[in-house]
Amino acid sequence: MFEAVEELIGEHADLEKKLADPSVHADQANARKLNKRYAELTPIVATYRSWKQTGDDIETAKEFVADDPDFAAEVKDLEKQREELTEKLRLLLVPRDPSDDKDVILEIKAGAGGDESALFAGDLLRMYLRYAERVGWKTEIIDSTESELGGYKDVQVAVKTKGGQGATEPGQGVWARMKYEGGVHRVQRVPSTESQGRIHTSAAGVLVTPEAEEVDVEIHANDLRIDVYRSSGPGGQSVNTTDSAVRITHLPTGVVASCQNEKSQLQNKEQAMRILRSRLLAAAQEEAEREAADARRSQVRTVDRSEKIRTYNFPENRISDHRVGFKAYNLDQVLDGDLDAMIQACVDADSAAKLAAA
């Protein structure tokens, strides 16, 4: 059933030998790569060995049933255990997203709906900050443009695991959970500015990209155009009298990143480069996916109410994820960061689709 695992066992043994060689660790980047692959294969190898041993134990127990009927109960228990190991191994063999261990850059953009959309973008920001707090992640607002009523026209946040270097265990990074948040989020509610009590519909867009390390993306200095300008706050009010804001354009691709929140031009440049690296990595991955027959759908790039992935209905206290048919009536709790059930529904649907395609 799991013939392909034998090849993985050989690769695992080969990696173990390499990692035991001190000279391998002289190249830290290569050693990290080998360690990562070894950590990915270890649970597969361990589960397969347990699965195989359980099969042998079942055959042995069956041989004793004729002489001692008590072994029939043991056979039943072992068969149940083997079924559980079979399913666990199937899930472990689902093709992994290579970015699942990474931290992310989260961007929320106000869209259709004007001021109400900007206020909703602020609600989404608070929801994600609360979720990160619940699961023990670290957050840092990189750049933001506030609206006049206190919402956000645009906000970018770095979300990291506790160590700030991605996941320590395979598949446990921020991207593994947060990648399902990318798309258009629609809200239905009575705005605070509505005097007639009418329900309005507006939308905000969420873009999630894995945060790239310098080794992930090669950027040449002569491919960049760096512009500096004066920072401004909500309503166009000046918050800085020097040209400290930075906009970086990657000329070969046209990808742009900017930052104005930091106090100095150097700090803004560093943050803008951080965003640019992540966007270039995401663009490269999407291009690879298109060439691989669109194995994973790209995130929504336009904030259009018709392209929604999720609806937040305040009058009914209802949250709906239209991709997986998830629906719950605890919107107040979701907006306070209780996202686990909804995200898990997306994880399960994604795993099922990958299993079916494997």
Swiss-Prot record:
Posttranslational mods: Methylated by PrmC. Methylation increases the termination efficiency of RF1.
Compartment annotation: Cytoplasm
Gene Ontology molecular-function annotations: translation release factor activity, codon specific
Highest taxon above the source species: Bacteria
Keywords assigned: Cytoplasm, Methylation, Protein biosynthesis
One Pfam family per UniProt: RF-1
Chief localization: cytoplasm
SMART domains: PCRF
Modified residues (N5-methylglutamine): Q237
UniProt cross-references to InterPro entries, sorted A to Z: PCRF (IPR005139), Pep_chain_release_fac_I (IPR000352), Pep_chain_release_fac_I_sf (IPR045853), Prokaryotic/Mito_RF (IPR050057), RF-1 (IPR004373)
Gene3D superfamilies in the record: 3.30.160.20, 3.30.70.1660, 6.10.140.1950
A cellular-component GO term for this protein: cytoplasm
Function: Peptide chain release factor 1 directs the termination of translation in response to the peptide chain termination codons UAG and UAA.
Membership in a protein family: Belongs to the prokaryotic/mitochondrial release factor family.
Protein name, entry field: Peptide chain release factor 1
Gene: prfA
